[in-house]
Amino acid sequence: MKTVFDIRIDFERSHGSFVFDKNTNEEFLDMFCMFSSLPLGYNHPVFDDSFDKKIQSLTRLRMCNNLFDSDELIDFKEAFKEISFHESIHFCSTGALAVESALKCAFEFKKNPAAMVLGIKNSYHGINGWGFMTDPEISSVKNRVIHFPQNDWRHYTLDDLIDYVRDSKEDIASVIVEPIQCTAGDIYLDINKLKELQ
C-alpha cells in the first residue's frame, strides 16, 4: 500500500515533535501528523509506567460513553469540570464524532428540518459525516467531497456570522466554531468577537 510520504516511523525513537524515520535513520520535525491529536508530542515523560498501568485497562475498554459510571470515569469528569466552562459533559471518541453528536443534539432540540448549521469560513470539523459539510471549500477537503451531497449550511467570516445570528435566530439549528483554525493555516479568531457571538 502506497503512503503519502516515504517515511517509516519508529515510534520508540520519536520524541517531542520529531519523528524518527527508519528508512533514512534520521529524525524530522513532524509538521503534518500529530500537531493537534498528540499535543504533548511523542514519548512525553508524563506517559511513564504508572500512567501506562492506570490507562491500560481503560484503553482496552474504550471508556468513552455516557451510559454508566465507573470510579475512573467519575475521577476524569471531576478533573475535566475544573477546566470546563459548562456543567454538562458528553464524551466522544474523536473530535469528528463530537461534532456529529453536537449537531444531532442541535437538530433534535430545534425540531426544524430546514434549520441550518452555520460555521466560520476556513473551519474544519473532520471528514466524518456532517463535519466536512460545515465548510467544504477548504482546499484539503474540497476535492474529497466534490461528489458528496451538498446542503444549504452556510459559512461566514466571524463578523458576518455575528450579524447573521443576530438577525436570523429562527433559521439556525447550530453555530459551530473552531477558535483556532489549523487546517486552513494558523488562524486565531478574536476572543472578544467570539464572546459576542456566544
Where are these regions (language model features)?
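Glycine-rich loop-to-alpha-helix module at the N-terminal edge of alpha/beta enzyme cores
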Residues: 7-8, 27-111
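Short, acidic, Ser/Thr-enriched surface-loop or helix-capping motifs
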Residues: 21-23
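PLP-dependent aspartate aminotransferase-fold enzymes
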Residues: 75-176
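Alpha-helical transmembrane segments of integral membrane proteins
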Residues: 182-183
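Short, basic/aromatic recognition patches
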Residues: 1-15
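Catalytic PLP-binding core of fold-type I/II PLP enzymes
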Residues: 187-198
